[in-house]
């Protein structure tokens, strides 16, 4: 049976993610105490219900991170496919969302300010984030989060999932990256008026960067680094690794390098491609 655990920071969009799972046909349970998870799975199996499970767990249920990891290992040992999704956002964004909704933080009744509650929650959940696929919703609306969840679920995983993500430094760096590479030293197609309207997915930009020795050296170097260290992360039972590749605006160089690297890693690892700034890309 496939089981998806959804966790993350309050105000980051866990409820939206869970509703998306429900719309996709998952049997969803919100705020389930973790000690009840094996019983829920057993009950589901006894009913001969083939519907996949999605369960939201967070600080409201007094989540014990050590227990969470034990439960995940236990269920995987029984042959179940357990995936973990962690939803987060930047602190300033969360503060704004709480202010707009006028809702209190789940930990705010413990004599803590909102900022203190957010910091405590982030520290508390960090060990769970380490084994999860992370979605940062800081610059997302509900529809974009739903799309990100659907894209993640499309990838069939049997081993380590490598997320290759392009981004623009001027919009901020992704906080869920395991490895980050800076492409701003490469020749920039943006300064060519004929190339500016395109992205790193388009043939004119590919032709331009294919002809730049520095760009090819960069791809070679990242490929060597990634293929050197990914096996070590696999040995540590990591399920997801995010490789973030940035340029100034996240439209040309970083997109090109991600796509180029994906072609080289295809067949060796399960890949998920994300372009944070280049939302509407045409194919090469």
Curated annotation (Swiss-Prot):
Keyword rRNA-binding part of the UniProt annotation: no
UniProt binding sites for ATP: 8-15
Pfam families the record matches: PapZ_C, RapZ-like_N
Annotated binding of GTP, by residue: 58-61
Keyword GTP-binding found: yes
Residue pairs linked by disulfide bridges in the UniProt entry: none
Function, as annotated: Displays ATPase and GTPase activities.
Protein name, UniProt field: Nucleotide-binding protein NGO_0315
